[in-house]
Amino acid sequence: MSKVALITGANKGIGLETARQLARDHGFTVLLGARDPKHGTDAMNQLRNEGLDAHFLHLDPTNSASIEAAVLLVSADYGHLDVLVNNAGVLLEADSAPPPQVPVSVLRDTFEVNVFAAHAVTQAFWPLLEQSSAARLVNVSSWVGSLSLHSDGTFGDYKPIALSSSKAALNMMTVHYAWQWRDSPHRANAAHPDKVLTSGNPHGEISVEEGAKTSVELATLGADGPNGAFLHLGQRLPW
């Protein structure tokens, strides 16, 4: 029986490519979590046309009823979940906006998706993850969530306060999830995909194929893999 992976925000970009690589290179059954049925179905058909075992799962990470329905479907069809990739995320602030000028509403809306929704999905699917022999939880973060790199001047004047704060919070949640699994075969880690060129990031510098690699690596970690780490292509990043 193949392992089952759920990727949120999987109808395009890094999420879709993560699903593709897990199915194509590692034999996973992949569940494409997406809010829009048409976009999710189109993504599923794209992977199926490549001969991959892909299924659309209607999932709005910001909607509790949608999450509950998705959990029931996965439980009924598979009885467990081996991998959860919290890939869904948003960048809502303008690149040039100084932190004091970013509206509170932008922070709230950013946290709603990047933090609260990720926790809601993780919380709901946690029992199914624990039914796996070796679950892998991957939170797609970003190095802009590193307090150390912002403090030492690495990013200069680039201070996207909503995005950075939300990813720092996601990193902290990852550490807490990992602590729950400290004496188990399960693993929880945060991934930095790098500057990926997507519809949501027109300033990206690398392909989605490259950007998905860290998530795939963390989703397929062996028994001796890290737990509670912040990584990019096997390299640890500073918190």
Feature names for model-found ranges:
Residues A168, D183-H186, A190-P193, T198, ...:
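C-terminal helical subdomain
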Residues I7-T8, N86-N87, R136-S142, R187-H192:
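Structural signature of the Rossmann-like NAD(P)-dependent dehydrogenase/reductase core
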Residues V85, V121-F125, L129, M173-T174:
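Hydrophobic positions on the long internal alpha-helix
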Residues P37-K38, H58-A70:
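The beta1-alpha1 cofactor-binding region of Rossmann-like NAD(H)/NADP(H)-dependent oxidoreductases
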Residues V90-L91, D95-F111, F116, E130-R182:
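Catalytic loop of short-chain dehydrogenase/reductase
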Residues E50-D53, L73-N86, L92, P103:
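A glycine-rich helix->loop->beta "capping" turn
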Residues M1-L31:
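Canonical Rossmann dinucleotide-binding motif of NAD(H)/NADP(H)-dependent dehydrogenases/reductases
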Residues H26-D42:
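Conserved glycine-rich Rossmann-like NAD(P)H-binding loop of the short-chain dehydrogenase/reductase
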